[in-house]
Amino acid sequence: MEPDWSSLESAARAALPRAYAPYSRFPVASAIQFADGAIVAGVNVENASYPLSLCAERAAVAAGVAGGHGPVRAVLVLTDAVEPTPPCGGCRQVLAEHGAPDVPVRAVTLQGRTAEHRLGALLPDAFRPASLDGRNPPPPRDVW
């Protein structure tokens, strides 16, 4: 399935005004296309206790998993930055748990600048369930 970049960007643009970023003043929206074709958006939600803040990409992954949509197939990240902003390291790790290394990740600015990478290029040698070497494997996923 080819990513529906137009719908992904529309979903992220619709979500961006709902970002809660009073501390960084750096709102971020993400839209993820899942294996079943569903597109789910997320926004960053900051907290006065900074480590408890939630990134837009992780919010979208969590909503997609809760909705039973299956593996990640494409990711779009939208900001009002001058340069396209790819996912942070923590989000890259979460995306690697739910998507394959060939998943396209597109960073877009409100002004239309874009950068695109494959998830595996953003996080080579990701820590994955197989990294546990068979100890404590995750339970089977009936949904996927």
Enumerate the predicted regions with their spans.
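Compact, glycine-rich, soluble single-domain proteins
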Residues: 44-58
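C-terminal binding/interaction regions
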Residues: 2-21, 69-144
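Active-site segments that bind and position negatively charged phosphate/pyrophosphate groups
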Residues: 24
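Alpha-helix C-terminal capping segments
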Residues: 62-69
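Stable alpha-helical structural segments in soluble proteins, enriched in small hydrophobic residues
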Residues: 12-15, 56, 60
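Short beta-strand scaffold segments in enzyme catalytic cores
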Residues: 27-34
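Structural signal for short hydrophobic segments within the conserved structured cores
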Residues: 40-43, 115
